[in-house]
Amino acid sequence: MRVLVISGLSGSGKSTAVRVLEDEGFFCIDNLPVQLFPTIIDLVNKAQETVPGVALVMDIRGRDFLKGFEKIFQEIDDAGHTIEIIFFDATDEVLIRRFSETRRRHPALESGSVPEGIRYEREQLSGLRRLATLVIDTSELNVHQLKEMVLARVKGEAGARRMTIHLQSFGYRYGIPLESDLVMDVRFLSNPHFVPELKPLSGLDPGVRNFVLEKPETTQFLARFEGLLEYLLPAYQREGKSYLTISIGCTGGRHRSVALVEELRRFFDRAGIAVKVSHRDMEKG
């Protein structure tokens, strides 16, 4: 099993890294005594549910448990697990500024200044830093760049910029989906609802699909909307967005929006982008 030990200075970005790992399916535990690492790893390894790995946070809050970690790590390695230590760091100036912005006291000292806390923390974690597989200096990174760097380490460069799309149809009659990032209203298209033989069918039916897609206005709309998506998706990815919900709506969510979502699915498939499709209101119309 792959084991990631997440460590580093307070305010350097560990919490952001853990959230990224949780999104990738890692089993994450914060502030666990190092002596319990082998037990947790063994339990997760024996569980029925498959996970890509375990991420364990180890920092100054567990100062009483920092001793003897090298022996524990060797025990984990001897058990056949791949252990990686990712250490997050930043300059003193940047850390001081971050603490000032959040108005938090430094967790390393009950009393004393933030600079004193940083110096003490560096000293306490120096041995762990020396063992690090990777040191990430976040001084010049924004949160999106940090997410990309963590993903690049976890999934490889090819996976760092992958985006998952949730493409869904809906009916305005039942309200706009609250989770939507992009909403497209296609009620301007000809409505199969008013064709007697098509009314009882859905947009999954070839007859309804042909009725909707063969109209010139549909062809023009798809060309423009797909062009917009080709522009927007890389921009969203540059900002660190890994999951995008696109909602396509018609009156009842049964005919036009369903047919268009299925056609857009093919667009994403051709582009090699992972897509999840759902039809929220198809059975209501």
From Swiss-Prot:
One term of GO molecular function: ATP binding
Residues bound to GTP: 59-62
InterPro entries: P-loop_NTPase (IPR027417), RapZ-like (IPR005337), RapZ-like_N (IPR053930), RapZ_C (IPR053931)
Binding-site residues, ATP: 8-15
Alphabetical UniProt keywords: ATP-binding, GTP-binding, Nucleotide-binding
Pfam family for this entry, one: PapZ_C
Function in brief: Displays ATPase and GTPase activities.
PANTHER family membership: RNASE ADAPTER PROTEIN RAPZ
Similarity section: Belongs to the RapZ-like family.
This protein's name: Nucleotide-binding protein Gmet_1286
Organism, scientific name: Geobacter metallireducens (strain ATCC 53774 / DSM 7210 / GS-15)
Lineage of the species this protein comes from: Bacteria, Pseudomonadati, Thermodesulfobacteriota, Desulfuromonadia, Geobacterales
